Amino acid sequence: MIEEFVEIEDTKHAGFAAAMEIYADAFPANTRFEVDLLRERIDKRLSCLYLGYLEDEVVFMALLWPLKNTEFILLDYIATKKNYRGQGIGTAFMNQINQMLSVINLC
């Protein structure tokens, strides 16, 4: 099962490139934002990128967008690496996020 979910606050982090590969594989081009736009949003803390690790490999990514001046957070994109799908990784992430939201400010 997944080892941990971590928020990446700096797109120079090694996991960012792996997350973008999962993102590109999971979503059709006409539904994706450009990587440069995502990089800018994450670096400016307008969006939050979470990665899921299994044996030091990034196997999951989620992009969250806290909506300004509201208490709402949009789960913009969520994806699991193709050969790890169907193992409950997305469910585990949703459970963790629900716990986090009950005690802290997410981003």
Model-derived features with residue positions:
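Conserved beta-strand in the GNAT
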Residues: L51, D56-P66, F72-A79
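Sequence-level motif detector for i,i+2 pairs with an aromatic at +2
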Residues: M1-E3, S47, V59, T70
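Short amphipathic alpha-helix that is part of the acyltransferase structural core
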Residues: M1-D36
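Residue-level detection of beta-strand scaffold positions
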Residues: E3-F5, F60, L75, F93
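Conserved acetyl-CoA-binding loop-helix of GNAT-fold acetyltransferases
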Residues: T80, G86-Q99
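Conserved GNAT acetyl-CoA-binding A-motif
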Residues: Q99-C107
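Active-site rim helix/loop that mediates acceptor-substrate recognition in acyltransferases
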Residues: A26-E55, L63
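N-terminal, well-ordered alpha-helical segments
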Residues: E21, I73-D76, N95
